[in-house]
Amino acid sequence: MKVKMLSRNPDNYVRETKLDLQRVPRNYDPTLHPFEVPREYVRALNATKLERVFAKPFLASLDGHRDGVNCLAKHPKNLATVLSGACDGEVRIWNLTQRNCIRTIQAHEGFVRGICTRFCGTSFFTVGDDKTVKQWKMDGPGYGDEEEPLHTILGKTVYTGIDHHWKEAVFATCGQQVDIWDEQRTNPVCSMTWGFDSISSVKFNPIETFLLGSCASDRNIVLYDMRQATPLKKVILDMRTNTICWNPMEAFIFTAANEDYNLYTFDMSALDTPVMVHMDHVSAVLDVDYSPTGKEFVSASFDKSIRIFPVDKSRSREVYHTKRMQHVICVKWTSDSKYIMCGSDEMNIRLWKANASEKLGVLTSREKAAKDYNQKLKEKFQHYPHIKRIARHRHLPKSIYSQIQEQRIMKEARRRKEVNRIKHSKPGSVPIVSEKKKHVVAVVK
């Protein structure tokens, strides 16, 4: 008589050690799981709710300045080191891991208008209202030695901004004109100007390092090529641009922070139309900085808040504010893409998480797997109304909330007026202008 025995491979169900998880046999046939999508929807909903529960972005406040913080700079080689300049001429160097000030320098008389680090991280440069450019060592002086700058350049006009070349011993300053300096000389290598108004900010391109951009008080954004020693082109907007920031991953993309509450992302090869208009702030945007990934940027505003925008979206994904934070003057995204720093005029530097609900520290493999799974579920169901409402909800200060409502009413009134004008005019006599093109006045080459 023949008897057929069931045989199973123990490797498929036996644990190697008692610490391993029990192996559960699964059949992935969809006919056996008719409620798979409803289950995933509930999981996505719970993951979205938990994300809002654990959204606690504020980490630390670095206090010590005796006047408003006017500018920030990152160390190019060290994640933990940050430099800040204040309105009383004081420069402080901070250690983010210990969250304390490790060095204080009385650098200028009056405002510190700009601060930047050398590409190798051995020194940094400051400019101030006292018409000087000073170079300082990154390491402090020895015991008993006085704090002295390495070099001091006496200028003829007030400098309003400074930025260092990403690869060479060259830096640029701006004021009445854009000056390109060699570190070994006391006179500028070349000076470039276009128009007569003062220039508030200058920034080198991190990829095409010979390109730089500046923004002036006459509403211009001017692009320069160091190799030509002449301006390339400029775009004139409706209102003044406070500063610009280049995308660290896409060579010809930059974002401008404007006085009309918006940010404009441009492609320098087609300046007549912005790539994207970013709208959410309710007051002038004062500073902008990209994340190292080039996918997002953070903006600082006069409305006492900072916002994080995806590059390809017109609305912000996150808004940060505190009860004590006043007008935010400067903002930086750290080089590891995990943290954001902002300096405001009530003398504090605040440290935030880039992802509000992110768990800090080392994650176990199961935590990583659960996090990735929840993230995929949230992306899959992100457009469902209930999940979308929970994910978008933010608590805002009453001042910002009321201003948002007011701006919404004004925008709707303008739209209604424009529709009525088109309706009661001869067909084709009133041009329809898109939101992107409304704010660009002209492009001059």
Swiss-Prot record:
InterPro entries to which the protein is assigned, alphabetical: Sof1, WD40/YVTN_repeat-like_dom_sf, WD40_repeat_CS, WD40_repeat_dom_sf, WD40_rpt, WD_repeat_DCAF13/WDSOF1
Pathway membership: Protein modification; protein ubiquitination
Biological-process GO terms, alphabetical: decidualization; maturation of SSU-rRNA from tricistronic rRNA transcript (SSU-rRNA, 5.8S rRNA, LSU-rRNA); oocyte growth; protein ubiquitination; rRNA processing
Major location (coarse): nucleus
Cellular compartments annotated: Nucleus, Nucleolus
SMART domains registered for this protein in UniProt: WD40
Modified residues annotated as N6-acetyllysine in this record: K49
Domain of life of the source: Eukaryota
Region (Required for nucleolar location): 353-441
Keyword tags: Acetylation, Nucleus, Repeat, Ribonucleoprotein, Ribosome biogenesis, rRNA processing, Ubl conjugation pathway, WD repeat
WD repeat residues: 64-104, 107-146, 149-191, 194-234, 236-276, 280-319, 323-362
GO molecular function ontology, one term from the record: ubiquitin-like ligase-substrate adaptor activity
Reported function: Part of the small subunit (SSU) processome, first precursor of the small eukaryotic ribosomal subunit. During the assembly of the SSU processome in the nucleolus, many ribosome biogenesis factors, an RNA chaperone and ribosomal proteins associate with the nascent pre-rRNA and work in concert to generate RNA folding, modifications, rearrangements and cleavage as well as targeted degradation of pre-ribosomal RNA by the RNA exosome. Participates in the 18S rRNA processing in growing oocytes, being essential for oocyte nonsurrounded nucleolus (NSN) to surrounded nucleolus (SN) transition. Substrate-recognition component of a DCX (DDB1-CUL4-X-box) E3 ubiquitin-protein ligase complex that plays a key role in embryo preimplantation and is required for normal meiotic cycle progression in oocytes. Acts as a maternal factor that regulates oocyte and zygotic chromatin tightness during maternal to zygotic transition. Also involved in the transformation of the endometrium into the decidua, known as decidualization, providing a solid foundation for implantation of blastocysts.
Homology family: Belongs to the WD repeat DCAF13/WDSOF1 family.
Assembly and binders: Part of the small subunit (SSU) processome, composed of more than 70 proteins and the RNA chaperone small nucleolar RNA (snoRNA) U3. Component of the DCX(DCAF13) E3 ubiquitin ligase complex, at least composed of CUL4 (CUL4A or CUL4B), DDB1, DCAF13 and RBX1. Interacts (via WD40 domain) with DDB1. Interacts with ESR1 and LATS1.
Protein name: DDB1- and CUL4-associated factor 13
